[in-house]
Amino acid sequence: MPTILVSALEASSNIHLEELRQNLPKDYRFIGVFEGKNALYSPREFSIMGFRDVIGRLGFLLKAHKEMVQLAKQADMVLLMDSSSFNIPLAKKIKKQDPHKKIMYYILPQVWAWKKWRAKSLEKYCDFLGAILPFEVGYYQKKAQYVGHPLLDEIKYYKKDIKGETLVFMPGSRKSEIAKIFPLFVKAAQILEQNEGFKRRVLVVPSFFKGLDLKALYGEDIELFEISYDAHKSLFEAEFAFICSGTATLEAALIGTPFVLAYRAKTMDFLIARMLVNLHYIGLANIFYNALNDETPGLGESQLHPELIQHFLSVEGLLKAYEEMDRERYFKESLRLREYLASGSARKIANEMAFLLNLT
């Protein structure tokens, strides 16, 4: 019975992890940080957004780090997913503790956007690097392989045309995102109803919010929306979507749903990020679309969908994006993007795990 130490701090990483587990033998035992039984911590305990939030939770993060290093002694191999600020130092400490411990990094940090030096650290401390973006392999020397993209395993609904019956609203999975973006979505939805008549409005809520007081999280205006916990099905049925920056924007692009990306951070966090990261776009679909068109990812001139970031985000901007988007062009180009990513990744990662465990 192989024991795998998992560090999956993000909600999206845990969705990818669940798909991966379906491709692994049933006797694999998981320990560490993930959504499920026998976890040391739930990913919800790591729901941190912004530089000041990290400082406020530093004591907890250091404690969790130390516990994970100790827990690694029980593991046959280590699986790290995303969250590089936590996971790269973790890989370093585990490798120092046991140089023979096999470490896989799946969902690599975005070294193509900032902190390119992390690529050397990953190759030094990890044994296999599972890249989910075709272009990011070029930033590594030898240990990175393109394994496909996990969303192509997980998405079961793909549009055949741009028709849809609903408007979908996805204001994020963090309380701070919801507080900043949901009120703008509410106002846009109300104006659209005044201008175009009633359309079904669907609010997609993260599945891990089930059982929580949604009115306390979203406010009284949540009553204006139908509630869905199934993002993919809701996007498939939608005419258009309003989405907070994150994995959901790429999901919409792959499904074929026209959308606008909305994002607003704390002013200080945004200014720090602008100093560290040199990108024109923050949406994954736009970044991939640049690469697809042989442009520098995130810095190209081509754009698949509109982005409204920081002070550019407004109700007027959301309405303009809805009204002016060339949906026929968008749909055609979204099909190209799906072809570019080629295939899912779960089976390939499962095979590589078996190889590292000497089970093949």
UniProtKB/Swiss-Prot annotation:
The reaction(s) this protein catalyses: a lipid X + a UDP-2-N,3-O-bis[(3R)-3-hydroxyacyl]-alpha-D-glucosamine = a lipid A disaccharide + UDP + H(+)
Metabolic or biological pathway: Bacterial outer membrane biogenesis; LPS lipid A biosynthesis
Keywords noted in UniProt: Glycosyltransferase, Lipid A biosynthesis, Lipid biosynthesis, Lipid metabolism, Transferase
Gene Ontology annotations for the cellular component aspect, listed alphabetically: membrane
InterPro entries: Glyco_trans_19
Organism superkingdom: Bacteria
Its EC number(s): 2.4.1.182
Coiled coil feature spans: none
GO MF term list: lipid-A-disaccharide synthase activity; phospholipid binding
Listed Pfam families: LpxB
GO biological process: one example: lipid A biosynthetic process
Family, as annotated: Belongs to the LpxB family.
Task performed by this protein: Condensation of UDP-2,3-diacylglucosamine and 2,3-diacylglucosamine-1-phosphate to form lipid A disaccharide, a precursor of lipid A, a phosphorylated glycolipid that anchors the lipopolysaccharide to the outer membrane of the cell.
HAMAP family the UniProt entry points to: LpxB
Protein name in UniProt: Lipid-A-disaccharide synthase
